[in-house]
């Protein structure tokens, strides 16, 4: 009888322990479902535009406003970015620099005003035809858990190995890739975990070179690079931006001193 009671007690304890574990799991699932529902309830963008080849790559923002969570982020901004020029956007953190770039590339839609590319409102482009005109190099680089070659070819899937190598040379990353045990076939970890910050950034630039888009958006691309890698990274950026329309977000004066125009953004407005 005592043995039976002991076994029953252990079985009851195990059941209660499982119930407690499942209770925690259900809470996590509930939170995830709530977050998913919040995303699904957001208004969706109309991305069914026309296949448009712009006549030029002039960019114009006309009296643009944008709010997020009922807070005005961009307030009545007008700006002209002529084709094949470099525009540097500077200002304090949270001032609206990255938001302006996101609106230009139509990651978000403006609340009022308009953004045009080649004289055509970006809303009239299909998403694919609009994105064909842009390449991006962000401060936070995301690389896939795949070979280095496939990460570079993400900019153009049909590229040959020779074209990948050429892009890597221009981005100053061919040398360190060649020293890896499997070269361009080396598989890197999720997010490029096995590479340094400078190495990841140069692979990101090689990817953008491979795409060969006419407009390049550089979002603080050299902000977190150590001094040893900065020279090579600057050379890589120079190779990427030749004969392109450049929009550059930066904190340091020396990275923008060669810009054709410098725009100071503060509290969602152009102040200089």
What annotation goes with each model-predicted range?
Residues 11-39:
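Cytosolic ends of transmembrane helices, especially the final helix of ABC transmembrane type-1 domains
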Residues 38-41, 45, 153:
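Conserved E/DxxT/N motif and adjacent residues on the DHp alpha2 helix
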Residues 54-272:
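ABC-type nucleotide-binding domain
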């Amino acid at each position: 009888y005592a043995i039976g009671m002991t076994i029953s007690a252990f079985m009851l304890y195990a059941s209660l322990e499982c119930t407690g574990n499942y209770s925690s799991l259900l809470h996590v699932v509930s939170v995830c479902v709530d977050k998913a529902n919040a995303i699904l309830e957001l208004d969706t963008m109309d991305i069914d535009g026309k296949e448009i080849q712009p006549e030029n790559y002039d960019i114009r923002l006309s009296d643009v406003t944008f709010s997020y969570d009922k807070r005005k982020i961009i307030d009545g901004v007008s700006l002209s970015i002529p084709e094949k020029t470099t525009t540097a956007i500077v200002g304090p953190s949270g001032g609206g620099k990255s938001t302006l770039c996101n609106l230009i590339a139509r990651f978000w839609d403006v609340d009022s005003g308009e953004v045009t590319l080649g004289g055509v409102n970006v809303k009239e482009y299909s998403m694919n035809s609009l994105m064909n005109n842009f390449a991006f190099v962000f401060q936070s680089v995301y690389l896939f858990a795949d070979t280095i070659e496939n990460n570079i070819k993400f900019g153009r899937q049909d590229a040959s190995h020779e074209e990948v190598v050429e892009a890597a040379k221009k981005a100053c990353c061919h040398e360190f890739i060649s020293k890896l045990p499997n070269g361009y076939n080396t598989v890197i970890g999720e997010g490029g975990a096995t590479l340094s910050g400078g190495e990841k950034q140069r692979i990101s630039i090689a990817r953008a070179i491979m795409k060969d888009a006419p407009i390049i958006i550089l979002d603080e691309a050299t902000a977190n690079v150590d001094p040893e890698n900065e020279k090579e990274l600057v050379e890589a950026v120079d190779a990427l931006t030749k004969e392109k329309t450049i929009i550059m977000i930066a904190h340091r004066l020396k990275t923008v001193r060669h810009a054709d125009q410098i725009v100071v953004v503060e509290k969602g407005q152009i102040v200089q």
